[in-house]
Amino acid sequence: MALHVMDEANRCLQCKVPQCQKGCPISTNIPLAIKLLKENKLDEAGKMLFENNPLTTVCSLVCNHENQCEGHCVLGRKGAPVHFSTIENYISTTYANKMTEGPKPSNGMRVAIIGSGPAGITIAIILARYGYQVTIFEGKDKIGGVLRYGIPEFRLPKSVLDDIEYRHLELKGIKVRPNTLIGSAITIEDLFRDGYKSIFVGTGVWNPNTLHIKGETFGNVHFCLL
């Protein structure tokens, strides 16, 4: 185990009223994850993190930690907060390598997901846990949406998204149809006629808020999130 990760975990005070958890938008049980890690129960910690947030590995890299979990840590009032982002990344990446379980038994119901951004991926994974037969329709050639095409490589390596596609989608029986736009050649009505009982639309917002400065329209200028 990485020593710096354990050193960071040992700094956690295990507060009775954890402010870090209150600062997390999805209420990740941060004290429990750290406690399990310190007890050498990494698999339990990883399972808990992924069940609460299927994109926990992504969030460990790109979340606004300084204003959320770490920003609410009581240790940060007089010094450095517990850097849970480091701990979460270690747990999630280590446990992800062990995630080889196949799909759940089918409940016979088909669901279409339009868009494979963070919302589409998350709802697809959660539905697959309950036996739904999920198909993701993606307009581009790779999954990820803003995660892949809006966040630069140094913040979120594309290998993380490729691993999610394999372990969380392919192994779970979730089908992905890339380069497929819904709305023109294929309509939502077509999907219902094809037997999909429910449809989730998570196409995202792709138009950037430009700065209106000289040179921003050049071909080698790309918009992204940092």
Where are these regions (language model features)?
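A conserved short coil-to-beta-strand element within the FAD-binding core of flavoproteins
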Residues: R177-D194
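Short, flexible, glycine/charge-rich loop motifs used to bind or transfer phosphoryl groups or to couple energy/partner
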Residues: T100-G102, I164-E165, I188-D190, L211
